Amino acid sequence: MAATLTVQDHLVHFYHLHALDWVSPVEALAADPIATANLQNTVLNTYKLPFRAPGASVTEAYEHDFPAATPQYFNEIKEKVKAIVESGQLGIFSANWWDHPDYKLLPPEVHLMAVAHYLEMLDKQRELVTPHVIFGGKNPHPHYVVGGMPCAISLEDGNAPVNTARLSIVDRAINMGRSLANNYYLPDLLAI
């Protein structure tokens, strides 16, 4: 639970609380989707720093969560952001100074890549906290099991709070956290 909280906390703080201090959805509109796809591949090849867990804790044959790196994907994101900006109601992108000159320090393709990952992490962060739900915790301040207050575990009973199916969900969340840190967070942090 603590590890998934740490990864989720870093993702939320980077993408949702700090990224828009450095990247702009308005600047992303000037990006070329083909150049952005090439940039995404370059960033992954250059900045991927594999976070490795002990071998016994790796339970998936391969990583499942990679950033999309196709021109079609980035064109879809660009069109989505364009519709939001042109509507004049920026919603999640409101209350910023998009005309500030420092937003021009990064190329538009970095802005588009980062905004795409910002949007992806809105969904991914929800999945990362499922271990908190399964073990009866909450976020961002999980309840840890106090002595004398056991959590019912049964690998056979489908109604037990912790069972085989729920443990596989926890395992998936842990592996997802590792993939997101390796393939999104660390490369984006170094690129931006």
What is the predicted function of each stretch?
Residues 1-192:
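Active-site bordering "gate/hinge" segments
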